[in-house]
Amino acid sequence: MKQMNKLITGVVTLATVVTLSACQSSHNNTKLVSMKGDTITVSDFYNETKNTELAQKAMLSLVISRVFETQYANKVSDKEVEKAYKQTADQYGTSFKTVLAQSGLTPETYKKQIRLTKLVEYAVKEQAKNETISKKDYRQAYDAYTPTMTAEIMQFEKEEDAKAALEAVKAEGADFAAIAKEKTIAADKKTTYTFDSGETTLPAEVVRAASGLKEGNRSEIITALDPATSKRTYHIIKVTKKATKKADWKAYQKRLKDIIVTGKLKDPDFQNKVIAKALDKANVKIKDKAFANILAQFAKPNQKQPAQK
């Protein structure tokens, strides 16, 4: 469950076990544990845990969460969070709660993770939209771009099923579309898709493979890895129609801009730049030297993040 444990790719992992946020609102001498001849207070717990890697990550996620909630709270609705949560829950079915527990998460903490991810994604996308895109960037995007294509796509959970289907479509006189309808496990038995190389709702491996096929050609078995579930799926593609690519990149300028902007969402350096901007706007100051370096990855070159007195 790689993606469930990642808040933002290459940026920060939520540590939900550490309760530093609760410590902030408690008196330092509040007793957490008592025993014969001794007690453990909030202060004891804080001082014991604050230098651990888990605490460092927890504090970083807490800082980013507070900053982005302040600046973008109304940009992500509870409905969006619930929808994303349900999508993952549906993918795991009855094992979802077990997978959450194995990842150190509860439904509530996972929803918080989803919300923060979406807040940061919104900020990154808005910043990307406002960035100046050079002609060089457009030309590079154009060179990699494949315009609209239509393909019959079969999807399988098991590789052996994909192999059996591949043998079936290789047979002389085989009807790929009919076999696809019969064999695919896709919802509603959908097999016909129209998309371009910037498509994000299909597996990236499938889009790349289709982009590389000529009209009328069929693929071998394509293995795709779902980043949200770390689950492999298997696909067979036949491209039935492919638009001729126009010679001038300007004919696709709007679409190319969308693709470039979407690409920024996957760029850790650009993400860090946006987070750094938000932290700077919030005037974040680290007061405890134990956490002096948690924002180092967001600092400008040669800029340190000393603890503030």
Curated annotation (Swiss-Prot):
Leader sequence residues: 1-22
MF (Gene Ontology): peptidyl-prolyl cis-trans isomerase activity
Catalytically driven reaction(s): [protein]-peptidylproline (omega=180) = [protein]-peptidylproline (omega=0)
Annotated compartments: Cell membrane
Residues carrying lipid (N-palmitoyl cysteine): 23
Any Gene Ontology biological process: protein folding
HAMAP family documented for this protein: Foldase_PrsA
Functional summary from the UniProt entry: Plays a major role in protein secretion by helping the post-translocational extracellular folding of several secreted proteins.
Protein name according to UniProt: Foldase protein PrsA 2
Native source species: Streptococcus pyogenes serotype M3 (strain ATCC BAA-595 / MGAS315)
Gene name of this polypeptide: prsA2
